[in-house]
Amino acid sequence: MRKWLIGLLLILGLCAGFAQAETYVVAVDGTGDFQTLTEAAAASSTGDTILLRTGVYGEQETFPIALDHAVTIEGEDGAVLDSPRFKTMVSVTADGVTLRNIRFQVRKWGIVADVSRAMTVEDCEFVLGDEECRTSSTAIWLRGMKDCAIRRCTFRQVGICIAGDPLSDKSAGKTVLTGMCEAGEDPEYFSTHEIADCTINGRPYYYFVGQDNLTVPTDAGGLIAVECDNLTVRDIDVSDSSMGLEIARSRNVTLENVSADRCGIFGTYLVFVQGAVLRNVHVEQTNHGIDIRGSQNVVVTDSLALNCDQGVFFTHCTDCTLQDSHVQGCGFGYFGAVGNGNRIGNCTFSDNADGIYLQNEPNATITACDVRQSRVTGLRILKSSCVCTDTTVADGWTGVIYYDSHDTTIENCDFSDNASANMYLGNGRGATIRNCRFSGETKAHLEVEGTQTDMLVTQCTFTGSRADMLKAASHTLPTFTDCAWSTPGVFWTGKEWNGSTDGDAPNRNCDIVQIGREAPRADSVPYDTPEQAIDGAVNYRKENSGRYLLLSQTNWTFRLFD
């Protein structure tokens, strides 16, 4: 009898559980249970269903609409979610969420699914709602998501992006998508989904997992390929998407004759790839044109990046190469970070903010490149080491910035007509600048700041006056050997002051000679001869060791600066 009662109670409990599932109706005109999806989602519980009647759900909603429990949202034909600009529409943080038959007017991110499982998206339409919001917009972000099913959906100018967990204090040292999420350390973030019967811009949206020796059909409008060996992608156009193509955890990949223009996130994205050749890849007006992360032995050749927010990215890459390619009109032409042994050869960079930017990038090689018209810096070397040879950096703002870097050789290069400075050295150590030519219209061939340790400039030629073209706010200078100046001019470093701490001379070696750096202080003192100027400088520095001295060759006036 007792067992029978227990069984009956279990059955009644199950029935009660099923009975608790509710169906709510949302209607803009007030004929449903709620007028907004925001309210319905907040009122619903696990297992409930929300029916979204025909209408546009926009200004009245609070975005993002949070789905933190398993709920099904199903729209009637004509049910539209329309978010404001730069707003995420739906945030999913629970397992088992279903969205069906809804049109998303995307102006940033449509659905963002974070660290959850088993989301289902069926029969939905995702459309870029505003051309001005294209950059960084995407229909579906899967961030740390597993077992997602996306079926019979249509995408126009936005697509699907797959990555790892949102950034946290555990992300340090991992490959990341800067400011957004980790690239995805867990293979299941990429491989456990179902993307079926979907189209993008009227063409098939392909998702392949574990298919070796695959050649992707040329009718592809979008591509996600995971754990494929000997993958060939040839003669396809994946433009007008979020990520035109995403290839993850694959080996021996060939991309050839691929276009990925006007993509909001990345045009061509390779992550955790072992061995690839990208040939004749064209990216234009895309956020990140060619983006390679966490990969080894990737070669990008004969490719073109035009007017992208960022041109070519190599981050956390090893032994990768960019060669015989052109990057123009981008933010960073090439950005390399936290990799090792990567190479740039025979490339041209023009009219970018930074032509080449190395950050925390050891053992890089730059050979036979032409970098011109950089709006900020032609070659920026930050906390990195490299060998740069046979390269021209010209017609920009600052030619080279070498800052807080080490163990670098710059040899047989030309630096000319960079308006602010042909080369800036800040806190450098262990660099050799050999057999280079500095010329053209510029405020300085070399501008030096901070501490210089084991820095050598040798066998270089400089046009103009040494007093004009070497400028510094530094206590130490590189060592110059066998260099030639068109006009030697006056240059004096006061070496007798080095290391003096006895009170008879300044404690720091921070005097430098130059002309016309900026307006002098009102108390500048004129002298009639160089000898008088030097004597005056010595006496002044004994009393004012915290100031810089700058000597005008024109009238032998020491200009005093705090």
Spans of model-derived segments:
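Sec/Tat signal peptide C-region and signal peptidase I cleavage site
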Residues: G17-A21
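Extracellular beta-rich repeat passengers
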Residues: F86, N101, V106-M145, R151-A183, ...
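Positively charged n-region of N-terminal signal peptides that target proteins for export
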Residues: M1-W4
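Short, surface-exposed, low-complexity cationic segments
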Residues: F208-D229
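Beta-solenoid repeat scaffold
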Residues: T49, G58-L81, V92-R100, T192-P204, ...
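Bacterial N-terminal signal peptides
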Residues: G7-C15
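Short, T/G/N/S-enriched strand-turn elements that build extracellular solenoid repeat scaffolds
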Residues: Q35-A43, G58-D68, V90, I195-D197, ...
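Acidic Gly/Asp/Thr-rich repetitive segments characteristic of extracellular carbohydrate-active
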Residues: T23-G58, I515-R559
